[in-house]
């Protein structure tokens, strides 16, 4: 935080300020880590599989310390992208340009979302050539996302993230089948 407001780590300070650091043990830090891990995972999927073969990667719901999602195919994600410390860049573009960008990338859900957006500008994040939209802050580069695992789960995958109280430890809990079934049915019903 800079003078009590959340700021991204790559912002330059131009005046004396009161600084306090956010960690993954707090809500704001954990959400930043979570968004960044999802973004890194999406980049890895698109790096491994040609874009035209991916119809959609869908992030569905939180399950314990993991995020459940689905895509067609068995796609491995390794740690090479994380270790490369690729910068996560943010740029602000016109909303109409965002509609065009996501249409070009085949991200039709986001293309439709921005057609109805009233704000004139949209923040787009990129890792290398891969671009996407996220609401909220991101880490400055991929090396910050050190602790995660990606495991198969039902028809999709579970992106396991660190336990909030111990940000260097990723648990591999057994999936509670009844809870999964309820969340999955609920998500499908609302889709």
Residue ranges and their predicted role:
Residues 37-50:
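Short amphipathic alpha-helix segments
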């Amino acid at each position: 935080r800079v003078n009590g407001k959340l700021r991204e780590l790559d912002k330059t300070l131009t005046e004396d300020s009161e600084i306090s650091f956010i960690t993954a043990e707090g809500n704001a830090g954990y959400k930043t880590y979570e968004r960044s891990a999802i973004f890194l995972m999406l980049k890895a999927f698109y790096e491994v599989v040609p874009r035209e073969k991916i119809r959609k990667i869908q992030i569905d719901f939180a399950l314990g310390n993991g995020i459940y999602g689905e895509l067609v195919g068995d796609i491995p994600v390794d740690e090479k992208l994380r270790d490369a410390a690729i910068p996560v860049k943010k740029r602000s573009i016109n909303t109409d340009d965002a509609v065009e960008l996501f249409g070009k990338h085949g991200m039709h859900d986001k293309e439709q979302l921005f057609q109805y957006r009233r704000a004139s500008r949209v923040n787009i994040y990129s890792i290398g050539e891969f671009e996407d939209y996220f609401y909220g802050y991101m880490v400055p580069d991929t090396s910050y996302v050190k602790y995660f695992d990606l495991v198969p789960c039902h028809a999709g995958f579970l992106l396991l993230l660190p336990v909030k109280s111990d940000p260097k430890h990723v648990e591999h809990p057994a999936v509670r089948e009844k809870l999964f079934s309820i969340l999955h049915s609920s998500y499908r019903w609302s889709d």
